[in-house]
């Protein structure tokens, strides 16, 4: 797998222009086990011999031949001996030669040998800390000649004159060390009882969980001449390479990944892995939100087409549009979008799985679960099953995509008419049925009710802001795409009679915690994108811009590149409107002549944090399997102590989310502050590359990052 990936990168490197070759490091993990010749034993020791890693278990040694491990003559386990250490030094844990002197790490201290029988205790200190180190289990010398220690108190670097000490406050994630090794260009790797840590330019990269290693308990590690680190654990060997790659090469990789393993009849969705963690064992899967996921992929390809003029991008955007339209055309009533379409002979008996008994079981724990059967009705032609009980998630995705497609991709009359037709059908369905999705049982779907009656009831009060805003957004998209004035007239009625625009100013619940679900951030921001982009009334634009800011203040530190891109794109438009002078207080809220100028100036100052977009795009792993990652043990985090907050929520000491490659999120609608998380499907599912593609191309389109 690793060799195939490296060949893929080589082929990519000759396919892009020089302006596209701004490179960054992409970490890639390979797990070695019985398939490549290793026994199922703990890997205890590692050395580099002739630039090849050689490992030892308790009874055997193996050398890497490039494709397989070969049993070789037993290499004795490394033993360290330091004579005449002070009696109170405790157990000798590590040892290294520093400037021609032996440095010994012990359970009770750090020592340097000044003469044959003379050991002096080292007490590291800098401007922040003064240590008497304990359990100094890791020592190494980097390529610049610095001494590094890993101790109970943290990590230290000594240049021969001064110390620099690192704890959780400086970003050190963990401190139960087992080993250390020097890499290239001053890089240092530490092994711990919970993963491996790379220190590069005083920044700590934490590599733990099955995403990076076969097991978290690292016994030993070593770095070869290319900078590859080989990591011995209790359950096999891990290998991590840092390879140079460009953003465009990464986009090409994820487009291919999505097309190869996630395209089912034009629908994009997570797949299923018959063998856990083995992407080659995939089979195409379905989700509850095929329409939303296909829409988001189509939006990514639309932005790609706008940025690059790539013919493939237009082809994929068109295919996505046709797939989304098919979801709408196949159902019982015009304009009702299905969640999923599958062949009548699909491998799973879905209506037996989603039986009446299934519904009753769900209602015991969820009183709002809808009892509808069949959940997969048969299409009129008898060839397909389609999933009902469609949610607001689907509609948010559909309308988000349709507006973007219409603006950036639709060029021919046929393309324009196709998107006009599907927007008209869905919007007319909502209006005709009292602003709700009416299912085949004649009732509203569980999550598809945008009616005034629902929004102003005990059942919908917590969704009032979001659903009111979404309905106005749908109508704005419909007005823009179709040009039919009836949709603006309908929106005006909802505003004047039911205050939907006032509700929209608080479009997302962020407290109490029990009302907070992260995917509503997607619904909110995707709908605000259509609402604000197509709104013509300056007073409403000011109100909706305030709603956007409220949402942003609650999510801005989660390092979600997609959310940053939406916020940045909408703020750009607002600032342009301010420059055009459309918020003239003579006409905009004239009852308070100070309000419009004040809000215009306030909301013209914005920061979508392009640095967070770039960091996240760089660090999104190429492996999108849903590994469980538990960060609650880290030294560099703070737990969210908000009353009512569920366990396992928090952020790093800098108040921002843990980097994306150190948490379990591989979808765009997850909570970046979830320190303990396993993606849906876990190791038995791979997520699609839209996770990278949509924020990347959207950020490029809005000039939030440069190619």
Q: Which residue ranges define each predicted feature?
A:
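Conserved beta-propeller blade signature
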Residues: 52-55, 101-104, 146-149, 187-190, ...
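Long, well-ordered core segments of solenoidal/helical folds
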Residues: 249-276, 317-333, 421-440, 486-507, ...
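Well-ordered alpha-helical scaffold segments within catalytic/enzyme domains
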Residues: 295-310, 382, 397-414, 460, ...
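Terminal, non-catalytic domain-edge segments
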Residues: 225, 235-236, 241-261, 524-707
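Extended ligand-binding groove/face enriched in aromatic
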Residues: 271-273, 315-463
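Loop/turn residues immediately N-terminal
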Residues: 58-62, 107-111, 152-156, 193-197, ...
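Bacterial Sec-dependent signal peptides at the C-terminal "C-region" and cleavage site
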Residues: 2, 12-22
């Amino acid at each position: 797998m690793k060799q195939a990936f490296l060949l893929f990168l080589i082929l990519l490197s000759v396919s892009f222009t020089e302006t596209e070759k701004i490179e960054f490091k992409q970490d890639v993990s390979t797990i070695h086990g019985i398939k490549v010749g290793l026994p199922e034993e703990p890997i205890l020791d590692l050395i580099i011999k002739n630039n090849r890693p050689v490992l030892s278990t308790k009874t055997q040694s193996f050398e890497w031949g490039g494709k397989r491990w070969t049993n070789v003559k037993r290499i004795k386990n490394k033993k360290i001996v330091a004579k005449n250490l002070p009696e109170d030094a405790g157990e000798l844990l590590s040892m290294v030669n520093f400037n021609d002197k032996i440095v010994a790490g012990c359970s009770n201290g750090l020592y340097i040998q000044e003469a044959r029988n003379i050991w002096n205790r080292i007490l590291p200190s800098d401007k922040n800390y003064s240590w008497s180190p304990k359990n100094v289990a890791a020592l190494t010398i980097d390529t610049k000649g610095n001494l590094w220690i890993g101790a109970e108190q943290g990590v230290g670097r000594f240049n021969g004159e001064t110390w620099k000490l690192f704890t959780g406050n400086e970003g050190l994630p963990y401190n139960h060390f087992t080993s250390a090794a020097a890499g290239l260009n001053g890089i240092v790797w530490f092994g711990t009882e919970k993963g491996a840590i790379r220190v590069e330019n005083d920044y700590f990269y934490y590599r733990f969980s099955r995403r990076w290693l076969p097991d978290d308990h690292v016994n030993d590690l070593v770095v070869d001449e290319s900078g590859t680190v080989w990591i011995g654990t209790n359950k096999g060997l891990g290998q991590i390479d840092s390879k140079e790659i460009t953003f465009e090469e990464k986009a090409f990789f994820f487009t291919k990944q999505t097309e190869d393993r996630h395209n089912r009849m034009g629908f994009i969705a997570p797949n299923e892995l018959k063998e856990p963690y083995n992407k080659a064992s995939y089979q195409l899967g379905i989700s509850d939100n095929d329409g939303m996921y296909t829409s988001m992929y189509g939006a990514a390809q639309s932005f790609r087409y706008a940025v690059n003029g790539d013919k493939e991008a237009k082809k994929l955007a068109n295919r996505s549009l046709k797939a989304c339209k098919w979801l709408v055309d196949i159902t019982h009533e015009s304009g009702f979008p299905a969640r999923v379409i599958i062949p009548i002979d699909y491998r799973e008996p879905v209506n037996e799985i989603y039986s009446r008994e299934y519904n009753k079981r769900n209602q015991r724990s969820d009183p709002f679960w809808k009892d509808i059967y069949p959940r997969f009705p048969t299409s009129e032609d008898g060839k397909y099953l389609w999933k009902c009980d469609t949610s607001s998630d689907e509609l948010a995705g559909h309308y988000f995509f349709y507006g973007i497609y219409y603006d950036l991709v639709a060029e021919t009359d046929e393309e324009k008419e196709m998107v006009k037709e599907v927007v008209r059908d869905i919007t007319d369905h909502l209006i005709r049925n009292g602003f709700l999705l009416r299912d085949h049982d004649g009732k509203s779907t569980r999550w598809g009710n945008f009616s005034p009656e629902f929004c102003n009831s005990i059942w919908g009060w917590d969704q009032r802001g979001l659903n009111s805003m979404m309905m106005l957004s749908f109508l704005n998209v419909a007005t823009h795409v179709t040009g039919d004035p009836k949709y603006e007239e309908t929106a005006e009625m909802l505003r004047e009679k039911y205050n939907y625009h006032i509700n929209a100013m608080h479009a997302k619940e962020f407290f109490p915690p029990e009302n907070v679900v992260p995917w509503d951030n997607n619904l909110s921001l995707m709908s605000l994108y259509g609402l604000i982009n197509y709104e013509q009334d300056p007073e409403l634009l000011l109100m909706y811009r305030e709603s956007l800011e409220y949402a942003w203040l609650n999510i801005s530190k989660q390092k979600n590149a997609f959310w940053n891109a939406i916020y940045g794109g909408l703020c750009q438009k607002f600032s342009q409107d301010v420059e055009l002078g459309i918020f003239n207080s003579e006409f905009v809220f004239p009852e308070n002549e100070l309000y419009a100028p004040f809000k215009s100036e306030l909301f013209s100052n914005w920061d979508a944090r392009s640095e967070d977009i770039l960091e996240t795009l760089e660090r999104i792993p190429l492996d999108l399997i849903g590994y469980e990652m538990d960060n609650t043990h880290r030294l560099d985090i703070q737990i969210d102590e908000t009353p009512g907050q569920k366990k396992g929520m928090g952020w790093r000491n800098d108040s921002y989310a843990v980097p994306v490659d150190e948490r379990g999120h591989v979808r765009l609608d997850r909570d970046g502050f979830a320190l303990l998380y396993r993606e849906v499907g876990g190791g038995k599912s791979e997520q699609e590359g839209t996770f990278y593609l949509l924020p990347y191309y959207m950020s490029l389109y809005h000039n939030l990052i440069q190619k």
